[in-house]
Amino acid sequence: MNSKAIKPSCEYFLLPGYIFMSPEPYLISTVVGSSVAVALWDADSKLGGMLSFLYPFRESSAESTAIYGNVAITYMVRMFREEGAKKKNLRSQIFGGAESDCCEADQIAHENVKTARSVLKKHGIKVISEDVGGRLGRKIVYNTFQNEALIYKVNTLRNSDWYPYDGQGRQA
């Protein structure tokens, strides 16, 4: 075990359509099926964050929210830049895009992964790892300080996997 490793003392559960980043060490957890999560990390400052999106892209600027991959990734890159990150120091990881028994969901899953790759490439951000596709959902725990992810692959996603808190800060 690395004696210099810092164990994050803060945790955040990331819902679909949200972006979270922090200069403090955090463990960010999320759950994805056909949706995609992208972790972004600045190798110099150790600034880390994650987003989760449901749909690949929104062409119109009206109603552009972080549920769309092109919007969420572009906005998170902007957030990192505003914190002083240089694009050359940014590294990313992509998770999700699982297939299902529904043809429409399969198409969305493939487009979600394709959008994540293309938008990151457009911004000049290197993808250092991917865990995408397949038929299993994923529970992800991302360490923002060390840029490490722990991935649990699951057959089914329960409602409590998506919403582990009862709204009053207590786990359900």
Curated annotation (Swiss-Prot):
GO molecular function, one term: protein-glutamine glutaminase activity
E.C. no: 3.5.1.44
Transferase is among the record's keywords: no
Disulphide bridges, residue numbers: none
Reactions mediated catalytically: L-glutaminyl-[protein] + H2O = L-glutamyl-[protein] + NH4(+)
Keyword Hydrolase: yes
InterPro entries referenced in this protein's UniProt entry, alphabetically: CheD-like_sf, Chemorcpt_Glu_NH3ase_CheD, Cytotoxic_necrot_fac-like_cat
Entry's Gene Ontology BP terms: chemotaxis
A family per Pfam: CheD
Keywords: Chemotaxis, Hydrolase
SUPFAM superfamilies reported for this sequence: CNF1/YfiH-like putative cysteine hydrolases
Alphabetized Gene3D superfamilies for the sequence: 3.30.1330.200
Annotated family: Belongs to the CheD family.
Function, as annotated: Probably deamidates glutamine residues to glutamate on methyl-accepting chemotaxis receptors (MCPs), playing an important role in chemotaxis.
Name of this chain's protein: Probable chemoreceptor glutamine deamidase CheD 2
Native source organism of the sequence: Syntrophus aciditrophicus (strain SB)
Lineage, top ranks: Bacteria, Pseudomonadati, Thermodesulfobacteriota, Syntrophia, Syntrophales
